[in-house]
Regions:
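The feature marks non-catalytic terminal segments
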Residues: 27, 66-85, 92, 96-100, ...
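Hydrophobic positions within alpha-helical membrane elements
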Residues: 14-16, 144, 167
Length: 252
């Protein structure tokens, strides 16, 4: 089966699902990550500060594209692909500051809707994995809601991943449950926690997850890579996703 993952920005799917995607590939599935809002000026750990303001979008967009490519090469299989929709991220699209992108309702222009829906249609996937929307980032909520509106039917296999680092720690438990309850109503199916991989050597899982996170070193520092990698300890070296009945029935 082909599984398509919606990643609002480059790195979101990698941080949350690096181990799961590896497990799906090892089980023989094809995986496509659709990176949506990829035109950006946000790369705090790059040299963007030395670039003229008129060139920052092209500079950052190119840097982050190389990071997606690094992850794809690390996976080492033709069954793993990454599709770039080249949409502007929220600060560029909505003309707001970086601190103003949270807690906003989904805001999707006709272009955004058309590109995301078209990508999902062209993927011809048998299952989708979408962000929960933890933290309320408008790009995450928008990508998720547009994808949900494009579902082929209520029984279509769909699952939701917990974004990182938003989903880390006890403080995240309540937002996770709130998102699950809300999305249960949206998909008209009970969402239950599932894991793509079986229990494995936890230290090995942490190391694998950290290697994936480090592909995106313009976005995060060493402390963040550790935080993201260590998150899988909570689930015995795995990543939790929330799946509808269609997903569970497909045995994914």
């Amino acid at each position: 089966m082909k599984i398509t993952v919606i990643s609002p920005h480059r790195g979101d799917a990698a941080f949350a699902l690096g181990l799961s995607i590896r497990a799906w590939l090892e089980e023989g599935h094809a995986v496509e990550v659709v990176s949506c809002f990829t035109r950006s000026e946000f790369a705090p750990y790059s040299d963007v500060g030395s670039v003229h303001k008129n060139d920052r979008v092209s500079f950052v967009t190119a840097v982050r594209k190389r990071e997606d490519e690094a992850w794809r090469k690390q996976a080492g299989t033709a069954k793993f692909t990454i599709t770039d929709l080249n949409l502007k991220d929220a600060p560029l699209r909505l003309h707001v500051g970086a601190s103003e992108v949270f807690g906003r309702a989904a805001e999707a222009s006709e272009k955004v809707v058309a590109k995301i829906k078209r990508a999902l249609e062209m993927s011809k996937a048998g299952a989708w994995v979408l962000p929960l929307g933890l933290g309320g980032h408008v790009d995450h909520v928008t990508a998720r809601d547009v994808a949900l509106s494009a579902r082929p039917g209520e029984g279509f296999p769909v699952a939701f991943y917990e974004e990182l680092p938003e989903g880390i720690g006890v403080a995240a438990d309540e937002p996770v449950q709130a998102a699950v309850v809300s999305l249960t109503l949206a998909v008209q199916s009970k969402l239950e926690p599932v894991f793509a991989a079986g229990v494995e050597d936890v230290e090995g899982a942490v190391a694998k997850k950290r290697r994936v996170a480090w592909c995106y070193d313009s976005q995060i520092d060493e402390a963040a890579t550790l935080e993201i990698a260590e998150a899988c300890r909570k689930f015995e070296g795995r990543e939790r996703i929330w799946a509808n009945e269609g997903w569970r029935g497909a045995g994914l």
